[in-house]
Amino acid sequence: MSTDEAQKPSKTYDASCHCGSIKLSLTLSPPLEDGHKVLNCNCSICRRSGYLLVYPEKKDVTWHDGSRERCTNYRFNTKTKDQMFCGSCGSSLGIDFLNETYYGISARTIDGIDLDTLTYKKLDGLNKVSPAQDLSGTGTKEAST
């Protein structure tokens, strides 16, 4: 590890669903308070899930007491991403990119942060990301945006 990496500021946050059944901790560098960018995307899944995403490495996320296994997952289109939510209270938790080394965790789940003070990066996913096309799995429905 280089000296720059060793001195890079980071902070660990606790996060959870609304009912508390799903709990995790994630470490971000730089910390949210120091301008860590939060993705605000307008694609169909981000809009409907209310996602404001941060992207910690999987090694920097700790799921407590089997919480990841208790997540309910939804997959569509390429079926390579789990949209994770709590099966009890329905809170949208984020995205498990199954073939990647990172998660997309919804900043809305992080305890004790003020969403109005965060630094956002907007993404026009509605117009710049390829449409999911058939979301039904039957080959008959058009994409819903």
What residues fall within each predicted segment?
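A short Gly-Trp-Pro
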Residues: 1-16, 21-145
